[in-house]
Design a protein with these regions (language model features):
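N-terminal beta-strand motif that seeds the catalytic metal site of vicinal oxygen chelate
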Residues: 1-28, 40, 76-78, 124-156, ...
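Short secondary-structure boundary/capping segments
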Residues: 6-9, 53-54, 68-70, 105, ...
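Vicinal oxygen chelate
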Residues: 23-25, 56-57, 61, 78-119, ...
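A short acidic/small-residue loop/turn micro-motif
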Residues: 70, 107-108, 128-132, 174, ...
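Core segments of cupin and vicinal oxygen chelate
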Residues: 8-11, 18-62, 145-188
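Short loop/turn motifs that cap or connect beta-strands within the blades
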Residues: 43, 67, 104-105, 194, ...
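Conserved beta-strand in the GNAT
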Residues: 63-65, 114, 124, 190-192, ...
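Short loop/turn microsegments at loop-to-beta-strand junctions
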Residues: 15, 50, 110-112, 142, ...
């Protein structure tokens, strides 16, 4: 890892979607069968529910957890770029997905289909057709997408809180943002105005930054509500959490230590015992 990326764990990028939903074990089976995901970590609570898990899909990481206490379910929308959208759509359906729409050629140059997984997350499965690459420039395999009422204000929040750069924005004649993309660090985040069946949908994202405390303060100053103030975590990062005005969760972190899976589990057990 280069010097500039020390605040990001190996294999991760600035932004990682964090799916909080029921049936994470079932979800991991789905993404493995449908998208060729590779499990990289899984840790269960005493009651058997999954406290944290992660998978790799080609060049992207995704994290998952089952709801617990104040952390409620937040099924998400994810844009997935792969070389053959039709084949991946068929695999997703065979793995237990429900069709949102069959693959079709879109006006923006993608061939795309939509599938809802058994845990309630929506996957927009696409192959880009305009550049000779299966993903548009700057995109990776996995891109999180926020659907909100008030996308223009959301873009302003992302700029103030996280230093986001707007790289694409399409508005309708009334000035409503239909779709936009911003760059945060090395990662793209998509945003759109909720409408029709595509209603508001809060989601969670893990955001790695050089100074978690400073970015947390910037998020609060930009209008977010604190969920947890930054502190050193047993799993090797300093992190805090904030919720924006649209209900999206931001887990703002700076990587501090690279730990083995065994060490994470040992520290987790100690943390659980200390918490009582």
């Amino acid at each position: 890892m280069n010097e500039q990326a020390k605040h990001v764990p190996q294999g991760f990028h600035t932004l990682t979607p964090y799916l909080i939903c029921g049936g994470v074990g079932r979800l991991m089976k789905f993404v493995t069968e449908a998208f060729g995901a590779v499990e990289t970590f899984r840790m269960a609570r005493e009651d058997g529910t999954i406290a944290h898990a992660s998978v790799r899909i080609v060049d992207s990481m995704m994290e998952m957890a089952e709801p617990s206490g104040e952390w409620k379910a937040m099924p998400a929308g994810v844009h997935l770029y792969l070389p053959d959208a039709d084949e991946v759509y068929r695999r997703a359906m065979a793995a237990g997905g429900t069709s949102l729409y069959e693959p079709q050629d879109m006006e923006y140059g993608d061939r795309e289909g939509g599938v809802k997984d058994p845990s309630g997350n929506d996957w927009y499965i696409a192959t880009h057709r305009l550049t000779g690459q299966f993903a548009p420039k700057g995109f990776r395999t996995v891109t999180p997408g926020l659907s909100v009422k008030g996308a223009t204000a959301l873009l302003q929040f992302l700029q103030k809180a996280f230093g986001a750069d707007v790289v694409f924005k399409k508005e309708d004649p009334e000035g409503v943002v239909r779709v936009a993309a911003v760059m945060i660090g090395d990662s793209v985040l998509e945003c759109s105005e909720a409408h029709g069946q595509w209603g508001p949908r809060p989601m969670a994202n893990h955001l790695y930054v050089p100074d978690a405390d400073a970015v947390y303060r910037a998020a609060i100053a930009a209008g977010a509500t604190s969920l947890e103030e930054p502190k050193d975590q047993f799993y090797g990062e300093r992190s805090g959490a904030a919720m924006d005005a649209w209900g999206n969760h931001w887990y703002i972190a700076t990587h501090q230590e690279t730990l083995s899976e065994a060490e994470v589990r040992r520290r987790a057990a100690e943390h659980s015992t200390a918490a009582g």
